[in-house]
């Protein structure tokens, strides 16, 4: 595993950035597809996509920095080093919402209609982005006993752990609640590998990738075809589906941002779900 997919002299191109670029391209393409289906202004959709992407990136980065402020105060040059990772998806959502509200006010359009366009592209883009997290060895899960793992850097500590596990009886192995057949051992140069060298971890970022793909299927192939949708119908369902996904994945993640003694993603996700359900029930007007 190597976070760099291409190196030309001193210039390094990272998978992290590549996945974001692919996510942006796919998201904009899907947004334009919806616009054509609904006879919507293509230029407006493209301009909105640009604003949503930029505001989402800024929001995601600021959110992450605020929750890790001591580190960035000591390492201020790392603030702009986004290729090292460090984006918070809830911050990205909040930043995207802020950008949407500003854009909608300038263009004098209902922001919920823009949200309906963005729902499918957003969650698919988030799924693609998790591949970049995997290549960076970040947003990883907790250690797990597992009979199989992808090993990139082996040291005696792992052999001792694995030998002990293999010596257990089948019934004893079944007593481990975290037993899964797909643990991943990351390079020690990565955040996951430096924190848990030579230990198999839950690939939490891949769990989220799968859940987001399922969420995209629900939004794109089921909810999108529902008639008599209210303004924001697709957007609020996107918030609910992604928030549920995030709550599930957070149980496996090890470095989630904390809000007092609670995981910040759990707190924010529950609030977002409650708000979304409220607005879904509030109106039942057809969008388009």
Swiss-Prot record:
| One Gene Ontology CC term in the entry | plasma membrane
The protein's matches in PROSITE patterns, at most eight in alphabetical order, are given as: LGT
Q: Which UniProt keywords apply?
A: Cell inner membrane, Cell membrane, Membrane, Transferase, Transmembrane, Transmembrane helix
EC number(s)? 2.5.1.145
Report the principal subcellular site: membrane
Q: Which cysteines are joined by disulfide bonds?
A: none
- Write down the Pfam families for this protein, in alphabetical order: LGT
Purpose of the protein? Catalyzes the transfer of the diacylglyceryl group from phosphatidylglycerol to the sulfhydryl group of the N-terminal cysteine of a prolipoprotein, the first step in the formation of mature lipoproteins.
NCBIfam families, per the entry: lgt
What is the name attached to this protein's record? Phosphatidylglycerol--prolipoprotein diacylglyceryl transferase
